Design a protein with these regions (language model features):
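Short alpha-helix boundary/capping motifs
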Residues: 116, 134-139, 187
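Compositionally biased, intrinsically disordered low-complexity regions
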Residues: 4, 91, 129-134, 141
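Short, glycine-/small-residue-rich phosphate/pyrophosphate-handling segment
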Residues: 77-131, 147-150
Length: 196
C-alpha cells in the first residue's frame, strides 16, 4: 500500500534521560535521541509499543514519551505544534493485567503532544498471567490470537486512513491552534470575558 516502515527499538539505543531535544547539551555524554527525533518528525504515523510492567507501560516507553515531549516546543510550517498532522497509536503486550490502562496513557500522551488519534488506535496481547512465554515465543498463541489480530488490523487501517485524510487535506486546519500566533499576541477569536 505504499507505506514504508522503520522500526526503532528504544531499548537498544542510547537514549539519555531528560526532556531536552539533545541531552548532550545538558551533561550527558551520549544521546541518540536527536537522530531518532528526525526519523519521528519525518513520519506520518507513530506507533509506540510497550510491555506491561506492574500494570504500567515500561520505563523505556515513558522515556520515549518524555523525549517526544522535549520536542514539543517545535512548530510546523503553519505555526502549529510539530506533531500536528500526524497520527499515533500503540501496541501493548505482556503477561499481566493493564493493557487498556497502558494504552490509555500512551494515547493520551500522544494526543497531548499534537498527534491525532484514530478510533481503535490500540492493540494488545496478554499471555497467561505470571511468568510465561512472550508474544513471539513458540507456543505462546500470540500470533494466532484472533482478538489481537483483529484489533491490530483495525489499528493499522485506521492509522492509514486518518494519515491519508490528514495528508490529502493539508493536515489540521491552521486557525485557532497556532502557537506562533498566540505568542505574537493574537487571541484567535478568544475574547477576554467582560466581567460586570
Amino acid at each position: 500500500h505504499g507505506v514504508a516502515v522503520d522500526t526503532i527499538r528504544a531499548i537498544d539505543r542510547d537514549i539519555a534521560t531528560g526532556v531536552w531535544p539533545d541531552m548532550t547539551e545538558h551533561g550527558w555524554e551520549r544521546d541518540e535521541w536527536p537522530a531518532i527525533s528526525e526519523q519521528v518528525l519525518a513520519a506520518d504515523i507513530l506507533v509506540l509499543a510497550t510491555p506491561i510492567w506492574l500494570g504500567e507501560k515500561s520505563s523505556v516507553c515513558t522515556k520515549v514519551i518524555e523525549r517526544l515531549y522535549g520536542n514539543s516546543h517545535l512548530l510546523n510550517e503553519a505555526g502549529q505544534y510539530a506533531y500536528y498532522g500526524r497520527v499515533g497509536g500503540c501496541i501493548v503486550t505482556g503477561n499481566e493485567d493493564g493493557a487498556k490502562h497502558c494504552a490509555m496513557n500512551v494515547l493520551y500522551s500522544l494526543q497531548h503532544l499534537g498527534y491525532t488519534i484514530p478510533p481503535q488506535a490500540d492493540s494488545a496481547w496478554l499471555g497467561e498471567a505470571g511468568p510465561g512465554p512472550s508474544y513471539l515465543d513458540e507456543g505462546s498463541g500470540g500470533p494466532e490470537n484472533d482478538f489481537t489480530n483483529r484489533n491490530t488490523t483495525f489499528l493499522t487501517w485506521n492509522l492509514l486512513h486518518v494519515a491519508r485524510m490528514l495528508k490529502d487535506t493539508g493536515g489540521i486546519p491552521a486557525h485557532g491552534n497556532q502557537r506562533s500566533e498566540w505568542d505574537a499576541g493574537c487571541r484567535l477569536d478568544f475574547a477576554n470575558p467582560d466581567y460586570r
